[in-house]
Amino acid sequence: IMTSPVLVTSDSYIQDAIITLFMYDADVIYVIDEDKLLLGIMSRKDLLRASLNSNIASTPVAVCMTRMPHIKICHKNMNILEAAVLLQDYAIDSLPIVDQENERQILGSVTKTALLDYIIQQARSTEVNREEE
């Protein structure tokens, strides 16, 4: 259920981040540095708030993003239930999936939508198997 994360660099402007968010129909944008390491995250809510309080064409996302280490993360070997609990407990829409040795190396992301799609697919599959028995 890991998906490709939507990325912008820390020197991108809020206006560019908003456009990127809607182009990819994403819930969040991950902010990376020049070495492609995770620096922060911006949700739709963060971008909306930033657009109300600043000049979006000239304000870098780095000014408004939630920074590491204040970001909830998961590792690729984390089970689905653990990821779901993090999403639910912290009321967030997406988690970055990071490398076990380097928690700034983003590998992908998991969203509430992808997780729910997976659960529904598994439940339907279980129903079909029961009906066939």
What are these regions (language model features)?
Residues 1-4, 18, 38, 43-93, ...:
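Tandem CBS (Bateman) regulatory domains
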Residues 6-11:
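Signal-transducing coiled-coil linker helices
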Residues 13, 21-28:
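Long hydrophobic segments that form regular secondary structure
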Residues 27-28, 93-95:
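Short loop/turn microsegments at loop-to-beta-strand junctions
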Residues 30-31, 112:
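Conserved SAM-binding loop
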Residues 32-33, 98-101:
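Core beta-strand residues in small-molecule sensory/regulatory alpha/beta domains
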